[in-house]
């Protein structure tokens, strides 16, 4: 069954008091599988199945949890990955497979795209540090391979980060941050994000961040009842 069909049926099934009906677990898991295969995403569904696993530990399926975590990484910089981690019980998070995803998430959340692409391309060299998170780097690319659209999603995430951190960026550096993307792909992404070419196309103008700074006025409404006791108290004011 297609993702759209499963999604429609599930949103009807998990509405209101039926949201955490354990009988929905099988259909939710099938929908997650469809998300992976068809490169789709539904935040409500992935968070609902994690909550159901918390409430019904006997139905827990780590394979589905891994897929959910990887899908939430594909929508960075949203907070879905952080939310998903919070819905996994502490007695589960020590799993080697889950730790591997958490370590990958830490790399992406810190915008360390150089390490990510090395892991994807098989060029990452593990350190001798006992706490080295990627002792077997090949496991990362193997884990991600079934996730349709994962690398493209990370490229778009990198572009969003670039949009808020760079004013100008060289094409060579941009290509590197996008995993060695071709000139054609770099140009297409630059156009999509509204970056202009400069210096014969070797540099992209991203944004004039200094010219787009917006001030914010913060108003706080204080009710009279909140300060009435202070105004009527006999405590003398502090001397400076």
Curated annotation (Swiss-Prot):
InterPro entries xref list: ARM-type_fold, CSN8_PSD8_EIF3K, eIF3k, PCI_dom, Transl_init_fac_sub12_N_euk, WH-like_DNA-bd_sf, WH_DNA-bd_sf
Domain PCI, first and last residues per copy: 41-221
Biological processes, Gene Ontology terms: formation of cytoplasmic translation initiation complex; positive regulation of apoptotic process; regulation of translational initiation
Location in or out of the cell: Cytoplasm
Keyword Protein biosynthesis applies: yes
Signal peptide bounds: none
A molecular-function term among this protein's GO annotations: ribosome binding
UniProt keyword terms in alphabetical order: Cytoplasm, Initiation factor, Protein biosynthesis
Coiled coil: none
Pfam families documented for this protein: CSN8_PSD8_EIF3K
Highest taxon in the source lineage: Eukaryota
Major localization class: cytoplasm
Gene Ontology CC annotations of this record: eukaryotic 43S preinitiation complex; eukaryotic 48S preinitiation complex; eukaryotic translation initiation factor 3 complex
Keyword Iron included in the entry's annotation: no
Gene3D superfamilies in the cross-refs: ARM repeat, domain 1, Winged helix-like DNA-binding domain superfamily/Winged helix DNA-binding domain
PANTHER family referenced in this protein's UniProt entry, alphabetically: EUKARYOTIC TRANSLATION INITIATION FACTOR 3 SUBUNIT 11, EUKARYOTIC TRANSLATION INITIATION FACTOR 3 SUBUNIT K
Function description: Component of the eukaryotic translation initiation factor 3 (eIF-3) complex, which is involved in protein synthesis of a specialized repertoire of mRNAs and, together with other initiation factors, stimulates binding of mRNA and methionyl-tRNAi to the 40S ribosome. The eIF-3 complex specifically targets and initiates translation of a subset of mRNAs involved in cell proliferation.
Family, per entry: Belongs to the eIF-3 subunit K family.
Assembly behavior: Component of the eukaryotic translation initiation factor 3 (eIF-3) complex.
Protein name: Eukaryotic translation initiation factor 3 subunit K
Organism: Caenorhabditis briggsae
Chain's gene name: eif-3.K
């Amino acid at each position: 069954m297609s993702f759209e069909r499963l999604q429609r049926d599930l949103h009807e099934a998990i509405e209101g008091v039926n949201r955490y009906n354990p009988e929905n677990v099988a259909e939710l898991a099938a929908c997650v599988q469809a998300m992976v295969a068809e490169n789709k995403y539904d935040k409500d569904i992935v968070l609902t199945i994690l909550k159901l696993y918390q409430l019904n530990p006997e139905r827990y399926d780590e394979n589905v949890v891994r897929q959910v975590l990887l899908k939430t990484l594909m929508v960075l910089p949203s907070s879905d990955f952080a939310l998903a981690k919070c819905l996994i019980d502490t007695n589960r998070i020590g799993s080697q497979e889950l730790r591997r995803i958490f370590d990958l998430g830490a790399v992406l959340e810190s915008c360390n795209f150089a390490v990510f692409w090395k892991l994807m391309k098989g060029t990452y060299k593990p350190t001798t540090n006992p706490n080295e998170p990627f002792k077997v780097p090949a496991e990362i690319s193997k884990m991600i391979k079934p996730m349709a659209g994962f690398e493209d999603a990370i490229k778009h995430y990198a572009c969003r980060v670039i949009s808020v951190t760079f004013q100008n960026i060289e094409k060579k550096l941009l290509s590197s941050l996008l995993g060695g993307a071709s000139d054609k792909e770099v140009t297409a992404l630059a156009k999509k994000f509204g970056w202009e070419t400069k210096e014969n196309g070797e540099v992209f103008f991203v944004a004039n961040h200094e010219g787009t700074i917006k001030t914010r006025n913060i108003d706080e409404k204080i009710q009279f009842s909140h300060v009435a006791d202070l105004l009527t108290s006999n405590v003398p004011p502090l001397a400076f």
